[in-house]
Amino acid sequence: MANTTSAKKATRKIARRTDVNKARRSRVRTFVRQVEEAIASGDADKAKAAFLAAQPELARAASKGVLHSNTASRKVSRLAARVKALSVSATA
C-alpha cells in the first residue's frame, strides 16, 4: 500500500496508463485479426485493405510504447508477406 502522497498519485497514474495501453493493444489485435481472417477467407482485396488499415495501428502502438518497434515491424513484415502470397496466388 502506498504511504506517501506522491506514491498514491503514481499508483493512480499507472492505473490510468494501464487502461489506455490495454485499449491500444486490444485495438492492434483486432486489426491484425481482421487481416488474418481476410487471408484465411482467400479474399486478396479484402486482405490488402485490412492490412493497409492495420499497418498504421501497429506503427502507432510502437511509437506509443505499447509494442516494441521490432515487434511491430516483424508483425507488419509477416502480414505483408502473407498478403502478397495471397495476391500472387489469386492472380496466377
Swiss-Prot record:
<comment type="function">
    <text>Binds directly to 16S ribosomal RNA.</text>
</comment>
<keyword id="KW-0699">rRNA-binding</keyword>
<dbReference type="GO" id="GO:0070181">
    <property type="term" value="F:small ribosomal subunit rRNA binding"/>
</dbReference>
<protein>
    <recommendedName>
        <fullName>Small ribosomal subunit protein bS20</fullName>
    </recommendedName>
</protein>
<dbReference type="InterPro" id="IPR002583">
    <property type="entry name" value="Ribosomal_bS20"/>
</dbReference>
<keyword id="KW-0689">Ribosomal protein</keyword>
<dbReference type="GO" id="GO:0015935">
    <property type="term" value="C:small ribosomal subunit"/>
</dbReference>
<feature type="region of interest" description="Disordered">
    <location>
        <begin position="1"/>
        <end position="23"/>
    </location>
</feature>
<comment type="similarity">
    <text>Belongs to the bacterial ribosomal protein bS20 family.</text>
</comment>
<dbReference type="InterPro" id="IPR036510">
    <property type="entry name" value="Ribosomal_bS20_sf"/>
</dbReference>
<dbReference type="Pfam" id="PF01649">
    <property type="entry name" value="Ribosomal_S20p"/>
</dbReference>
<dbReference type="GO" id="GO:0005829">
    <property type="term" value="C:cytosol"/>
</dbReference>
<keyword id="KW-0694">RNA-binding</keyword>
<dbReference type="GO" id="GO:0006412">
    <property type="term" value="P:translation"/>
</dbReference>
<dbReference type="GO" id="GO:0003735">
    <property type="term" value="F:structural constituent of ribosome"/>
</dbReference>
<keyword id="KW-0687">Ribonucleoprotein</keyword>
